[in-house]
């Protein structure tokens, strides 16, 4: 699953749709972790959509990632500021790719 310490153990390598991206990244095979409040490990995400369905405040939006070995799209936490910390996304993710931490 996602490294719960990624916010301190990984380097911020960029920004995407208003949230930080934690490396390493080497597209299209290695995409890193997107988000700080709601972190999604793009390298673990298999795009089953359970987090998108479970989230009551629409934190996630599909983002196309052609060529990635795990899936061709990812649940991108573009509205992480809206998170109400219900942990629904964390609880339903089949590959434990999400970590939520209040700011």
UniProtKB/Swiss-Prot annotation:
Cofactor field: [3Fe-4S] cluster; [4Fe-4S] cluster; Zn(2+)
Cofactor mode of binding and number, as noted: Binds 1 [3Fe-4S] cluster. Binds 1 [4Fe-4S] cluster.
Region (N-terminal extension): 1-36
Protein name stated in the entry: Zinc-containing ferredoxin
Organism: Acidianus ambivalens (Desulfurolobus ambivalens)
Gene: zfx
Residues holding [4Fe-4S] cluster: 55, 83, 86, 89
Residue(s) carrying N6-methyllysine: 29, 101
Keyword Ribonucleoprotein in annotation: no
Keyword field: 3Fe-4S, 4Fe-4S, Electron transport, Iron, Iron-sulfur, Metal-binding, Methylation, Repeat, Transport, Zinc
Keyword RNA-binding applies: no
């Amino acid at each position: 699953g996602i490294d719960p310490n990624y916010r301190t153990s990984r380097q911020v390598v960029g920004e995407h749709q208003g949230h930080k991206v934690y490396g390493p990244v080497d597209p299209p095979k290695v995409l890193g972790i997107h988000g700080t409040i709601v972190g999604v490990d793009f390298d673990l995400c298999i795009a089953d959509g359970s987090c998108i369905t479970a989230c009551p405040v629409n934190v996630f939006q599909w983002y196309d990632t052609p060529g990635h070995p795990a899936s061709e799209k990812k649940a991108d936490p573009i509205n992480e500021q809206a998170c109400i910390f219900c942990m629904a996304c964390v609880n339903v993710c089949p590959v434990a790719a999400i970590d939520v931490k209040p700011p």
